[in-house]
Amino acid sequence: MFGSATANPPAQRNLPSGDGDGGAPDAQAPYLLEISHVSKGFPGVVALNDVQLRVRPGSVLALMGENGAGKSTLMKIIAGIYQPDAGEIRLRGKPVSFDTPLSALQAGIAMIHQELNLMPFMSIAENIWIGREQLNGLHMVDHREMHRCTAELLERLRIKLDPEELVGTLSIAERQMVEIAKAVSYNSDVLIMDEPTSAITETEVAHLFSIISDLRAQGKGIIYITHKMNEVFEIADEVAVFRDGAYIGLQRADSMDGDSLITMMVGRELTQLFPEREKPAGDVLLSVNRLSLNGIFKDVSFDLRAGEVLGIAGLMGSGRTNVAETLFGITPSDSGEVRFDGKTVHIGDPHQAIELGFALLTEDRKLTGLFPCLSVMENMEMAVLANYAGNGFVQQKALRSQCEDMCKKLRVKTPSLEQCIDTLSGGNQQKALLARWLMTNPKVLILDEPTRGIDVGAKVEIYRLISLLASEGMAVIMISSELPEVLGMSDRVMVMHEGEMMGILDRSEATQEKVMHLASGHKVH
């Protein structure tokens, strides 16, 4: 799935105008949900400071802001997970307070989390009605009635799934549909969706958006949290922006463009999202010839020069990540040749790859990158700890000094190196993981979805860092599902489709149309 850093506004929708300077939208329609002067603090941190938010019935409100802006905290307050320190919540015009998520759900507010909360070994029907099972005259669970109600619910939402299918057999997108059906089954008037498209394909996104449009037509109020601006302009009626725990303002989506939205989010104008770079003139550092992994990808060939950024584009399942993992020795190739620094090499495991000068920032930092219960320093030192150990001792002072230097260079925002890394924002977690690999002094840096799930301000910092590393002679392979990112950062773009390399485009000839044409399985003639 390809996202976008900037996008064109959609056609105008019939909505009252919003404000652009922190006020409230015009009261031409009754509000479904109103948040007034809400504040929330944690030890040493003010997460929300006197914020407001209003949701109209039959509308999609996109909620945007950098990581740490307070979006998630406010949503957890609305959903009954946290209780506010001050302020008021009004639902359908009446003051409400929620002690638990169940009380919010019963009142008509449902939150669909980014990490889905379903039971994999239970059926769709059982997941939807868990805790609310229909009973027959004998006070036993009436499975037939549950099946009938689930089938009706899925049909109404145009979700083509069997109520008896086990949730564990469903794709991520299908599980999201089940979560939506479950929320609707509570007759929820307000649905909160947190990054719902972060791990689904372009086709699945289109299906999700059609369901959201149906819910909007039914009068539901939808709060849609996302970092992807193209989604905002495609699906949202209004956009609310938070920054540093404060409400910045609300605008109609069709009155904004990408630049004005970025300015609201970061508090400054980002005149250039992607830094300017000159085409490198370094020597070939890595040469890959007909690299293959049986059943996954075949005959992948390319050269990578020192100081070059090679982008790899393709739809999900195209084999991009598999190529990266093979180069790093996670899944050794079945055939083909890899030449590094002029010599043929056989990379059998990641340890060999690191010794040669390879580094890999993996696709899913939470699953394969972070040690969430460890500190920032413990996460950063993982790849170089052996270099500072000897005779049963670790050179803690020197190791700490290097970690501090990397934090300064990469602008990792953390109260201390002892801070648990799981408490940092997504952007700072990603920079800490990048610091881990830069401490190994790699010659080839492989970045798999380096800006996934981080805000636009952190993205700009990552882009500038990549450009700086390339200018210093590091060779970079960057895999990304965001097409503007690939085109904006790469000197050349390699495009893959179902395990096959479809072509390599030079920066001067690469366009969204050409890349999508190749990614869809069509050769450029």
Curated annotation (Swiss-Prot):
Described function: Part of an ABC transporter complex involved in carbohydrate import. Could be involved in ribose, galactose and/or methyl galactoside import. Responsible for energy coupling to the transport system.
Gene Ontology cellular-component terms listed: plasma membrane
Lineage: Bacteria, Pseudomonadati, Pseudomonadota, Gammaproteobacteria, Pseudomonadales
Similarity comment: Belongs to the ABC transporter superfamily. Carbohydrate importer 2 (CUT2) (TC 3.A.1.2) family.
Location within or outside the cell: Cell inner membrane
Record region (Disordered): 1-23
Translocase among keywords: yes
Protein name: Putative ribose/galactose/methyl galactoside import ATP-binding protein
GO molecular function per UniProt: ABC-type D-ribose transporter activity; ATP binding; ATP hydrolysis activity
